[in-house]
Amino acid sequence: DAYEYLMRHFATESGKSKGQFYTPAEVSRTIAQLIGIGPHNSNRQTTAYDPTCGSGSLLLKLAAEAVNKITLYGQEVSATTAGLARMNMILHDFPDASVQSGNTLADPKFKDGERLKTFDYVVANPPFSDKSWSSGLTPDADPFQRFGWGVPPAKQGDYAYLLHILRSLKASGKGACILPHGVLFRGNAEGAIRKQLVDSGTLVGIVGLPANLFYGTGIPACILLLDKDNANARRGIFMIDASKGFLKDGNKNRLREQDIHRIVDTFRKAQDVPGFARMVGFDEIRSAKNDYNLNLPRYIDSSAAEDVQDIEGHLQGGIPQRDVDALHAYWDKMPALRTALFASAGRPGYLQLRLPQADIKPAILGHGQFQAFQHAVAALHAQWAKSTRPSLVDFGQNGSPKQFIHTVSESLLAAYAKAPLLDAYSIYQHLMDYWAQTMQDDAYLLAAEGWQVHTTVETNKKGKATGWACDLIPKPLVVARYFAAEQQALEAAATALDTASSALEALEEEHGGEDMAFAGFDKVNAAQVKDRLREIGKDKDAAEERDVLKAWLKHAEDVADLKKQLKTLDAELDAKAFAQYPQLSVDEIQTLVVDDKWLAALSAAVHGEVERVSQALTKRVKELAERYAAPLPQLAA
């Protein structure tokens, strides 16, 4: 939304000094989905609280996930930023949200008598390692008994906010807090608090985030997920290392749609994913080896496999078989392709290419099993498109774009969930990128006006028409479907013009040197050429020059004629296309939008993913072949 855009832009431009009040929208959405709120478990009596609410973006993302109206509470130390949060609440139709200004730890504003008020959901992105957290507070004599597990270090207030959150949760409440990675492994007072936190069973999950996501700091952070409900029966903590999934966006990193979906799906399923996520039992966490250290690399190895150089391969030649075996994902699907590419190198454990390096890519693309893979993906996509098309054309006036893209994207993700060699989340990302760039605008237009089209005449500053456009169905789609012959004629004329123009330029270049036909011309044009022809007349000594100048005039005339022809054809095609729009039926509009625009764009994106499979395999095979092509003794000789 507009407010979110302005907040992101302001945080980006302001940097460290002013960016701390804003939690990136992608992180807020991730938390809102991880925490488990939804229309099935929320109503007006559901309460959500952010003790360090900044501009309120995290609370509002939680409310958006709930769908139903819930009751929001927030406290912010900066009076100015609290004012921003109140305005944000009003703009997002939460005028009754209670946003208070003040120091949450020293002067919490939400209380039930002498105790802290408790809430169903608490979310927070507190200042990292707050050095003045205890200002105005005597932790050992805290009236709200927040520090029974221990007092955090004087210069690191991360656990102070976490303990406040725990005290602010109802007996079955759920919470999420963004904190620096240090809270997972720092010792002394924080280690003692962490032990109590683990043993309490309220820490249900940890999500490690990429570095440089947040404004004001580049250090990596994590999301601690809390759940008091059934805490005593909990037997472990679900950990996710999502540090590798992000998009570089200017000088910051940003979670993509696929990153958010992967994190949330994995957490909800509590599904072990090598290198990404696993359920870690309390026994492992409490072991002498780990001693309550929750640092994610202790439990999840997300590092890329090392590309080991093989000494024997360098000395005697041959590609190590283990490097070829490492490409098993390809060979599992295309075993005969491996045989077509590699043969024994004459000794155990080493292989050699069967073909020249230049033939690797053609061999892969032309192999029957790779082509079968291509056909299988095409068939899978065609089946998805066929089954999804009815829901695409059924969307229309008064429809919900948000629900629309959710349904479509989830069906796409499910369709590609078991597709070999393709990452379903990457396919999903293509759809979400297209949604953000184009399809979202189409959906909102359809929701407002239904399946109808309007052309807009474009004018210059003087009010003169300069062209026209249609947002829902761009001109090229209408031309491609109804005027292919005219478009082909236009392209042929353009090609002819390019050829004639090139011939004219070549003639000028060939005869532009010293003492040649065009040597004395400042700029070659028809007037100068004709003047020169009159000047030399029928001079026999200038016969060659005369022929060149006459040839130039003929080429120039051809170029001028072709330009006129091209302009005429373009104007005729433009007029035909413009006249076609009012004649389009609803079925035709749906065909142009759904088939020729939406599904065609997604089909091209899927084809690109298949291309990347061949490129990745080609690159690795070629890399191995080049690495071990010449044994070191041969190089030394």
Predicted regions: what is each one?
Residues 12-16:
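Conserved adenine-nucleotide phosphate-binding loops and their immediately adjacent elements
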Residues 113-471, 490-505, 509-636:
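A conserved structural/catalytic subdomain of Rossmann-like adenosyl-cofactor enzymes
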Residues 2, 31, 85, 224, ...:
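Residue-level signature of catalytic and energy-coupling elements of molecular machines
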Residues 17-124, 129-150, 159-160, 179-182, ...:
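Conserved S-adenosyl-L-methionine
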Residues 468, 482-485:
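Charged, extended alpha-helical/coiled-coil interaction regions used as scaffolds
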Residues 1-11:
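Long recognition/docking surfaces used for binding and targeting
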Residues 474-478:
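Extended alpha-helical interaction scaffolds
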